[in-house]
């Protein structure tokens, strides 16, 4: 990232610089910087980033891709995440990064942490999510958007109607923004489902997070609903599909 007080760096691939001259990260304002270079395929490589001055250096990420058909999955997992945090990010830089990556699909999953926030209301939450989805659409108009709702949790005395209100707010926000919506909560079985899943070894002892087997089960449910939504699979009679297409 270029920024005030930014330093200079060199980038090396297998010990050799990929630059004709050092890269300056100095800029009057924060802005994303991108560097692209090729490497021989089907081999291991070592990438080094060396600072050449005492200036600030911030690396937002490294992407290694093959020029071949397939799926590239970029993941950004943040502990204690809330949708509102997106609004605190540098919006021009976020837009630049999304424009450079050109995603075909952007997936957001929120709700587990917000459900315990004091003063939470369905109306304000729906408005927040709809605004975030619109911003992402403006930054990456070619991308489809998918909002995933939270799984059930049974560690706190959260009324089932409050969780249901959150799912309704998320579904309405997705519909308003032309995004798809999938409910983990409903896929699990709704209220008190976490107790059942934990008893089956699918939920962790905190009754908030799933085990590896639980997340695999939920992923299978999502895949079933996704293929059903596109007419490529027969419905699972044991479950009701929970994916809303835009």
What are these regions (language model features)?
Residues 102-115, 123-139, 146-184:
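Conserved N-terminal glycine/acidic-rich loop preference
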Residues 40-42, 99-100, 139-140, 174-176, ...:
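Extracellular/periplasmic catalytic domains that process cell-envelope and extracellular macromolecules
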Residues 91, 151-246:
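Catalytic His-Asp segment of secreted/periplasmic serine-dependent ester chemistry enzymes
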Residues 27-32, 79-80, 103-109, 137-141, ...:
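Short C-terminal domain-edge/linker segments immediately following a structured domain
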Residues 1-131, 209:
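Conserved SGNH/GDSL esterase-like catalytic core that processes O-acyl groups on lipids
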Residues 37, 50, 137, 162, ...:
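Generic detector of short alpha-helix boundary/capping microenvironments
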Residues 71, 143-145:
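Residue-level recognition of the N-termini of beta-strands and the immediately preceding loop/turn
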Residues 96-97, 135, 225:
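A generic secondary-structure signal
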């Amino acid at each position: 990232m270029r920024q005030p007080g930014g330093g200079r760096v060199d980038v090396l691939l297998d010990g050799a610089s990929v630059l004709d001259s050092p890269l300056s990260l100095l800029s009057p304002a924060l802005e994303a910087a991108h560097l692209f270079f090729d490497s021989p395929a089907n081999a291991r490589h070592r990438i080094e980033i060396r600072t050449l001055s005492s200036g600030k250096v911030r690396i937002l990420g490294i992407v290694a891709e093959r020029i071949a058909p397939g799926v590239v999955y970029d993941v950004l997992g943040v502990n204690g995440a809330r949708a509102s945090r997106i609004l605190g990010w540098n919006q021009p830089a976020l837009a630049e990064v999304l424009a450079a990556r050109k995603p075909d699909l952007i997936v957001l999953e929120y709700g587990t942490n917000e459900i315990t926030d004091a003063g939470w209301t369905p109306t304000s939450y729906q408005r927040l999510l709809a605004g975030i989805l619109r911003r992402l659409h403006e930054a990456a108009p070619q991308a489809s958007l998918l909002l995933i709702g939270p799984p059930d949790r049974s560690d706190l005395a959260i009324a089932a109607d409050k969780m249901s209100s959150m799912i309704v707010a998320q579904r309405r926000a997705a519909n308003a923004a032309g995004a798809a919506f999938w409910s983990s909560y409903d896929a699990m079985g709704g209220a008190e489902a976490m107790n059942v899943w934990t008893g089956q070894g699918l939920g962790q002892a905190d009754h908030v997070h799933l085990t590896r087997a639980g997340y695999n089960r939920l992923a299978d449910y999502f895949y079933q609903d996704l293929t059903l939504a596109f007419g490529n699979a027969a419905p699972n009679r044991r479950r009701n599909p929970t994916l809303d297409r835009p």
